[in-house]
């Protein structure tokens, strides 16, 4: 089996990582360090290349399932599990930066808080951030996964968590898998319904942010709130 030790010395990614730091490694080299070994037919770097090619780079690889990974020749359950665990740790580390009572002062703060987690999602996720009186995030909840419409996103589910957490206000977010954050008619209808319910029960819906690919739209800034 071809492992990292079998690669030509100047191409050994683990040794380069130790000498030059992880930031000096390419995507294929970092992947090789995680995989550790290749197969009888190919080196670990060639296996890395094959995986990256199969998923068209990191964008699709980050959401790869166990079944998709093991379908690649040379990747077994153990290697696939290592990769999936590494990707999940990466996502959690990104979130850690913002979990210490992150304060939201404007739509940009809100988009920055959720952008990296939501912009690559393959389905629409409707998420609520629950804030205290200082506009600090005290909880977040995924309310619904799927195409957004006013009959599915029920105010009861949104405000139930607000009462549980004694939240002072709410910010709603959802992503557009197309990457285009332009609001649809349904997006606007859902927003207006939630805002009206919030007014009645005394928990303000501050904004509804639509996440695209490194772009976002604030429905408050657009005048829909």
Curated annotation (Swiss-Prot):
Keywords of the record: Hydrolase, Metal-binding, Metalloprotease, Protease, Zinc
GO BP, one annotated term: proteolysis
Annotated source species: Bacillus cereus (strain ZK / E33L)
Family matches, as CDD domains: MPN_DUF2466
Annotated positions binding Zn(2+): 174, 176, 187
NCBIfam families: PRK00024.1, radc
Residue interval(s) of motif JAMM motif: 174-187
GO molecular function: metal ion binding; metallopeptidase activity
Domain called MPN: residue spans: 103-225
Name of the protein: UPF0758 protein BCE33L4198
Superkingdom per UniProt: Bacteria
Entry-linked InterPro entries: MPN, RadC_JAB, RuvA_2-like, UPF0758, UPF0758_CS, UPF0758_N
Family matches, as Pfam families: RadC, UPF0758_N
Family: Belongs to the UPF0758 family.
């Amino acid at each position: 089996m071809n492992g990292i030790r079998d690669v030509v010395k100047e191409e050994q990614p683990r040794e380069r990582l130790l000498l030059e730091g992880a930031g000096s490694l390419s995507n294929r080299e970092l992947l090789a360090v995680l995989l550790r070994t290749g197969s009888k037919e190919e080196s670990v770097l060639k296996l890395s290349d094959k995986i990256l090619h199969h998923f068209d780079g990191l964008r699709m690889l980050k959401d790869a399932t166990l079944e998709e990974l093991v379908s690649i020749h040379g990747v077994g359950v153990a290697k696939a599990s290592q990769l999936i665990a590494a990707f999940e740790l990466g996502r959690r580390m990104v979130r850690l930066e913002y979990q210490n009572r992150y304060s939201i002062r404007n739509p940009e703060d809100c988009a920055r808080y959720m952008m990296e987690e939501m912009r690559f999602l393959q389905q629409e996720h409707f998420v609520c951030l629950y804030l205290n009186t200082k506009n600090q995030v005290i909880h977040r909840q995924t309310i619904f996964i799927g195409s957004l419409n006013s009959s599915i996103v029920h105010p009861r589910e949104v405000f139930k968590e607000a009462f549980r957490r004694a939240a002072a206000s709410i910010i709603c977010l959802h992503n557009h898998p197309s990457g285009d954050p332009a609001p649809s008619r349904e997006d606007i209808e859902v927003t207006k319904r939630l805002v009206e319910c919030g007014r009645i029960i005394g928990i303000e819906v501050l904004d509804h942010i639509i996440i695209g690919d490194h772009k976002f739209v604030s429905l408050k800034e657009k005048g829909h709130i």
